[in-house]
Amino acid sequence: MENKKTKGISLFALLAIIISGAIGGGVFNLANDLARGSTPGGVVISWLFIGFGILMLVLSFNRLITIKPDLSGVSDYARAGFGDFVGFLSGWGYWISAWTGTIGFAVLMMTSADYFFPSKFANSNGSLTILSVIIVSIISWILMLLVDRGVETAAAVNAIVMIAKLIPLVVFSITGIILFKANVFTQHFWQTFTTNFAADGSVKDFVWHAMTVSGLLSQIKGSLMVMVWVFVGIEGATMMGNRAKKKSDTAKATVIGLAVLLVIYVLLSLLPYGYMDQASLANVKAPGLVYILNEMVGGWGGSLMAVGLMISLLGAWLSWTMLPVEATQQLAEQKLLPSWFGKLNKYHAPSNSLLITQLMIQIFIIITYFVANAYNVFIYMATAVIMICYALVGAYLFKIGLKEASVKNILIGFFTFAFQALALYLSGWQYVWLAMILYTIGFLLFIGAKKESHQSISVKEWLGMLVVTVLGVLAIVVLICGAKAGTAFDLRGLLGF
């Protein structure tokens, strides 16, 4: 009898997908991004709040893996709980989030290269140069071809990249601990402040005040998008659950991944506060850890961190090339996208989904030449859209808890939903509004899938599509015509146009 080797993604490879997906570029900008809006005390409270919210999300995933082992991925959960249309919104939103996140990786990678060759790869307003657009386009197509050769092969490569990317972060942590100055760290630990900006947009100085409740809430709000972004990817093992050697490994990988990520993020966000004063930290160029380590130990440190960041971004980029096509393939299997999206090549990779995703990435890579602060724009959009997917995971577990009278599932589901909804309301709804344009395009495919499978579209689904389409059209109108500068509806200002 022929002995066939069992294929599938191992526990270590699943863990690598989570860590490589989450530790992309955001962690390298974490300290200086947080310093612009939060003191060390505010950062600690923010980590407690956001850590609790992410823990609830992880527990929701793990509970659903256990009680609904036949389901896999965020769209599966949303569809099972709330029907085809909501399942489509979740899966399509996950797809949007994943590939817009890769644009953020591309921008930050070129910003890192700018450390070695100043002004060659990034413009002063945060947009990419034409040279950068060409380079990241080539890299993006290479990564697509790698995944097209087989998702399991790509996952193995990702495990190697994970180890390589952690080395400079460990070096930074050790250096930060050795050079830590308690008096610098505690100088303004529990205060709030107003910021005076210089003409070039840099922080001129902070005016310090005693901490107040409103001041603390403002610091937490200012930290939300930055902190939630660095956890996007925590669901990677769940999304790849159908390809795992053992389904139970997905839950283990998610819990271990959360613990590892929390330790890394808390260290890397707080240690710089103990090395330089907050105004200096807030003015550090992006990517922050590159220039902070350069300040700590000299040029070799900055070079090590810049190389580590580029490896990190390539690893995250590879992970995020796998995740969006898993989402579209699952939608096709659920008959929420045309079957064309679910077709596999001889390497069992969804080639058609990869091609469509890559074409969207290519279009938006070109757009980075025109968008100011392109990194923040794309990572904020990716974070805001995926919050909807995460909220639906919590809502589904909450619904199951009510049906089964399980207090544990009710509480975990409720806190997951409440955290994601609150975070989205406080800091990201404008980006979701922009994403409505892409949702509207997806409805054409949803309608096509329904016709292909000879299913009718309900009145509620038509109404849902109408509401989202109207919002998408309004977003286009505001982008073209503009809105009052500085208001919440100023989408052109949001994009730096």
UniProtKB/Swiss-Prot annotation:
The keyword Metal-binding does not apply. Disruption phenotype: Deletion does not affect the growth enhancement observed in the presence of high L-arginine in different growth media, and uptake activities are slightly reduced. It is found in: Cell membrane. NCBIfam families: 2A0302. This is Arginine/ornithine antiporter ArcD2. It holds the Pfam family AA_permease_2. It is a multi-pass membrane protein. GO terms for biological process: amino acid transport. It comes from the Bacteria. GO terms for molecular function: antiporter activity. The lineage of its organism: Bacteria, Bacillati, Bacillota, Bacilli, Lactobacillales. InterPro entries: AA/rel_permease1, Amino_acid_antiprt, APC_superfamily. The gene is arcD2. Gene3D superfamilies: Amino acid/polyamine transporter I (1.20.1740.10). Belongs to the amino acid-polyamine-organocation (APC) superfamily. Basic amino acid/polyamine antiporter (APA) (TC 2.A.3.2) family. Catalyzes electroneutral exchange between L-arginine and L-ornithine. Can also efficiently translocate L-alanine. May function in vivo as a L-arginine/L-alanine exchanger in a pathway together with the arcT gene, which is found adjacent to the arcD2 gene in the ADI gene cluster. The chain crosses the membrane at residues 8-28, 41-61, 88-108, 127-147, 160-180, 220-240, 255-275, 297-317, 354-374, 378-398, 406-426, 429-449, 462-482. It catalyses: L-ornithine(in) + L-arginine(out) = L-ornithine(out) + L-arginine(in). Keywords: Amino-acid transport, Antiport, Cell membrane, Membrane, Transmembrane, Transmembrane helix, Transport. One of its GO terms (cellular component) is plasma membrane.
